[in-house]
Amino acid sequence: MRKHLLTLLAILAAAGIGYRFGQTTTARAASGRVFEIRTYTAEPGKLDALHARFRDHTLAIFKKHNMTSVAYFAPTDEPRSKDTLTYILSFPSRDAATKAWVEFRNDPEWQKVSKESEANGKLVDHVDSVFAQATDYSPLK
């Protein structure tokens, strides 16, 4: 009987630790700093206009909405060098990212810039977005 009781207690303790670890991981994922890695594929012939829009307008609007620019990249090898822009944003949390994107999309300045920059056709064919957290060994946290 005592052996069964000890076994039951061990199972319950392991389940409790596992549950608590899962809560910690989930809470950290919801509230810890996150990075969003976004890759834009431009419409044919529109990459220069896309770079100009980011350079001249988008970064300032990001800043206004607490969207921290980490880095912007242009591929060096074809064919991606002809149509791709990749960048990384940082947010205090996933919830903050969601809120910032809603505010950004509803910003009258962004809506004006977007409309004007696409007067001769849309600039972006599609966007790929991935949210990530820095690993414990990453130099960038």
Name each region found by the language model:
Residues 4-5, 17-21, 25-31, 52-70, ...:
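An amphipathic, aromatic/His-enriched active-site/gating alpha helix that lines ligand/cofactor pockets
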Residues 9-16:
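Hydrophobic membrane-insertion alpha-helices, especially the h-region
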Residues 10, 132-135:
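Short beta-strand-to-coil "C-cap" segments at the C-terminal boundary of structured domains/repeats
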Residues 35-39, 86:
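Active-site-flanking beta-strand signature of metal-NTP-handling nucleotidyl enzymes
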Residues 42-51:
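Short, surface-exposed ligand-recognition loops at beta-strand->loop->(often short) alpha-helix junctions
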Residues 45, 75-80, 93-96, 135-137:
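Solvent-exposed loop/turn segments at secondary-structure junctions
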Residues 140-141:
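Soluble, non-membrane globular domain cores that form compact, hydrophobic packing
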